């Protein structure tokens, strides 16, 4: 199993340690992802096998957490100041409150217009014309499923809105071979047209243009759309989209995509393989140590090790209540407390849960003990000072939806971000 997958699988541990220490996450830029397998797991010292460096472990987990969100580091404050479109916040709220609402894609991004050149309508050309400039960037391992252009349409002159609106608009993809970015003569491709009946947000499907832009992956050319708007009603001779700088209703793109890297499935399979290997190794070591200790104990004390099981078990049952057994308990994670509130938009906090309590003999079915956990518990009863109890650990993790800003300040909604909350606890 790769060290990166291991650390991502243990993300809840990283969160829990940071919260319990009540310290902000600092020096992210100093964490280097280029560690070897030994150092990235927090094992330090060539001659000190098994020495665990917690600080190094946490620093490398920070790097992998950011990498799993396609972030190279903590987004700068300057790029995270702009407020995300209300649409993205509404989308997040819908997915988190309505469990039956499932998006077609697991990643949603919004890209605001960067610039616009506008031309007013004339008698010879009765259209409002706009060249909209965007900067669309999607990781290559993601597959775009849909792209929408959202425009706010309104009547720019004072009229009685009760009469409604009547007009149309057409959207073109401005090709890269145009001589200047604000000219589109003869270098545009028709994308979509739409009738206008009411004032408000209009959604136009423009997936083909965005897919072309991403395939081109050009850093020298801007992503350009031409939008023309025409009014068909005399009572509103200036029907137009909202483009003035500072407007709350500026045009923006919404791009839906799926992560094709399949990292969740790969991580789960590798984690399962690693756990199985570790359990087999620990079982062999535990049995070997138990036999050695048993021989020493019987020679020195002349006792049968199993005679202590009954009284020990009785005392253990009397001293432990139901609440001290392995179970899932609440653990609130507040992103402001750990220094992430500048780039994580929502949730502000969530319940990560944690596993607390002991694994006492006999192990109940609700803690889903493995064969190794059962054997380790039995050996612990016989040699409590030599062999530790089985551990109460997460056995199943659940996802949360997270709305955050990436390196470029792009609002990104990741639906079902895996491994962020404990779903079940057990003895391992």
Curated annotation (Swiss-Prot):
Subcellular localization: Secreted
SUPFAM superfamilies tied to this protein: Cystine-knot cytokines
UniProt cross-references to Pfam families, sorted A to Z: TGF_beta, TGFb_propeptide
UniProt propeptide residues: 23-318
Keywords: Angiogenesis, Cleavage on pair of basic residues, Cytokine, Disulfide bond, Glycoprotein, Growth factor, Secreted, Signal
PTM description: A reversible disulfide bond can be formed between the two subunits in the homodimer; this has no effect on GDF2 activity.
Main location: secreted
Coiled-coil annotated residue ranges, if any: none
Signal peptide boundaries: 1-22
GO cellular component: extracellular space
SS bond list: 155-236, 326-392, 355-425, 359-427
Sites carrying sugar chains: 70, 135, 262
GO BP terms, alphabetized: activin receptor signaling pathway; angiogenesis; BMP signaling pathway; branching involved in blood vessel morphogenesis; glucose metabolic process; intracellular iron ion homeostasis; negative regulation of cell growth; negative regulation of endothelial cell migration
Family as reported in the entry's similarity comment: Belongs to the TGF-beta family.
Stated role: Potent circulating inhibitor of angiogenesis. Signals through the type I activin receptor ACVRL1 but not other Alks. Signaling through SMAD1 in endothelial cells requires TGF-beta coreceptor endoglin/ENG.
Subunit structure: Homodimer; disulfide-linked. Detected in extracellular fluid as mature homodimer, and in complex with its propeptide. Interacts with ACVRL1, BMPR2 and ACVR2B with high affinity (in vitro). Identified in a complex with ACVRL1 and ACVR2B. Has ten times lower affinity for ACVR2A (in vitro). Interacts with ENG, forming a heterotetramer with a 2:2 stoichiometry. Can form a heteromeric complex with ENG and ACVRL1. Interacts with type I receptor ACVR1.
Protein name: Growth/differentiation factor 2
UniProt lineage: Eukaryota, Metazoa, Chordata, Craniata, Vertebrata
GN (gene name): Gdf2
